[in-house]
Structure formats: structure tokens, C-alpha cells
């Protein structure tokens, strides 16, 4: 279910403050965040945001094609290592 157009996209306040500060200074530095639910907005383009995946922060460079998506979509939390090769219990 999509968000209502009457509402604005969710972006964490601390993330907006950091972005506004960097945009006024015209500096580029890595922004560390735990807010995976924040929506990518046009003011984030060109910045690198380190998104927490539960274990570490993964740096993601924001491009114009990412607008409207959530930050958590670009930081996978699970690491699938494949199925067991010799699983004799499941064959019984």
C-alpha cells in the first residue's frame, strides 16, 4: 500500500538537518544513519549515506534514479550462503 499523496514522504529530522547543513556549506561527506525507513528525496542526490544493516554501515551513493525509494532498500540485511549440499535428513 502506497503512502497518501496528501502526506509528505517520511524523512528523519536528524537526517534532514545534516543534509541541509552540508548543502549550505556545499560539502560532501559520508552521513551515518540508522534510519532505513527514510525516503530518498531530491536534496540527497550526490551525497553518500552510510545505512545500517544491523551489523555495519554500508555506504550508498545517492543518484537521481533512487528518488522515492527507501534507504533500507539499498542495504541488505540478510546474507544467503546457499543451500546445504549434503543434507541427508531432508531426503528421508
From Swiss-Prot:
Listed GO CC annotations: chloroplast; mitochondrial small ribosomal subunit
A Pfam family annotated for this UniProt entry: Ribosomal_S19
Coiled-coil segments on the chain, per record: none
Superkingdom of source: Eukaryota
InterPro entries: Ribosomal_uS19, Ribosomal_uS19_bac-type, Ribosomal_uS19_CS, Ribosomal_uS19_SF
GO terms of molecular function: rRNA binding; structural constituent of ribosome
Disulfide bonds: none
Subcellular location(s) of the protein: Plastid, Chloroplast
Any GO BP: translation
UniProt entry keywords in alphabetical sequence: Chloroplast, Plastid, Ribonucleoprotein, Ribosomal protein, RNA-binding, rRNA-binding
Location, primary (coarse class): plastid
Protein family according to the UniProt entry: Belongs to the universal ribosomal protein uS19 family.
Cited function: Protein S19 forms a complex with S13 that binds strongly to the 16S ribosomal RNA.
Alphabetized PANTHER family for the sequence: RIBOSOMAL PROTEIN S19P FAMILY MEMBER, SMALL RIBOSOMAL SUBUNIT PROTEIN US19M
Name of the protein this chain belongs to: Small ribosomal subunit protein uS19c
Amino acid at each position: 500500500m502506497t503512502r497518501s499523496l496528501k502526506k509528505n514522504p517520511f524523512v528523519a529530522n536528524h537526517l534532514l538537518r545534516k543534509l541541509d547543513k552540508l548543502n549550505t556549506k556545499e560539502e560532501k561527506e559520508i552521513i551515518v544513519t540508522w534510519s532505513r525507513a527514510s525516503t530518498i528525496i531530491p536534496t540527497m542526490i550526490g551525497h553518500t549515506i552510510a545505512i545500517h544493516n544491523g551489523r555495519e554501515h554500508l555506504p550508498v551513493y545517492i543518484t537521481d534514479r533512487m528518488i522515492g525509494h527507501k534507504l533500507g532498500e539499498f542495504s541488505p540485511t540478510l546474507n544467503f550462503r546457499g543451500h546445504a549440499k549434503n543434507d541427508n535428513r531432508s531426503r528421508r
